[in-house]
A protein has these predicted regions:
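Terminal targeting signals and extreme-terminal segments of soluble enzymes
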Residues: 1-192
Length: 192
């Protein structure tokens, strides 16, 4: 089992209640970084819905207090179950205190015309051709599981135009790209 799979491991207690365990090796500052929390909430929702025709369509996530080491409950509440779309709220809690919560909409695929056409072409430089960022002690603890690749950087306040950072990131030990793993990745790129 890869480190990310271990971090996103859930034990089902009831159909809507799961247990997870936060560990210090995923810390960023005072607690587990938000991507792990988001990944756990996505995994609990996916397990609760138990329908592969449904996929996440929208989501907001709120971090209420530091997610410190130890066991936590992940609780799913169905707000509305529909034939094509369902709305849920997922909570990560410890001793009846909310650590983080997420509102989600999960829906079936719909056939529809695209309403947005990008006005510029994105050219992705292969990661083998850009800087592989070395791990340094000042990085958050969880970065030992992540590899960053930096293509370009224009820091603020240096007169270099609009600030931007462009590159890639991935887990060093890869895992299939599931919705929970993708959720964990959403918060790992340092400008996030």
């Amino acid at each position: 089992m890869t480190p990310i799979d271990q971090a996103l491991n859930l034990t089902q207690k009831t159909p809507s209640l799961y247990e997870a365990h936060f560990t210090k090796d995923w810390y960023q500052g005072r607690g587990v970084y938000g991507g792990i929390q988001l990944g756990l909430m996505l995994k609990a929702a996916e397990t609760f819905i138990n329908d592969t025709d449904f996929a996440p369509r929208s989501m907001t996530c709120h971090y209420c207090e530091p997610a410190t080491e130890g066991p936590v409950d992940v609780r799913v509440q169905m707000l509305r179950a529909g034939k094509t779309i369902s709305h849920l709220q997922v909570f990560i809690e410890r001793e009846d205190k909310v650590i983080s919560s997420s509102l989600m909409s999960w829906g079936r695929q719909r056939d529809m015309e695209a309403v947005h056409t990008p006005d510029d072409q994105r050219i992705l430089v292969p990661k083998k051709d850009i800087l592989k960022v070395p791990h340094v002690d000042r990085m958050p603890v969880f970065c030992k599981y992540v590899q960053f690749y930096l293509e370009s950087m224009s820091p603020p306040y240096l007169g270099m135009g609009e600030p931007s950072i462009k590159g890639y990131c991935e887990f060093i030990e890869s895992s299939p790209l599931t919705f929970p793993v993708l959720g964990a990745m959403l918060d790992m790129w340092w400008p996030s």
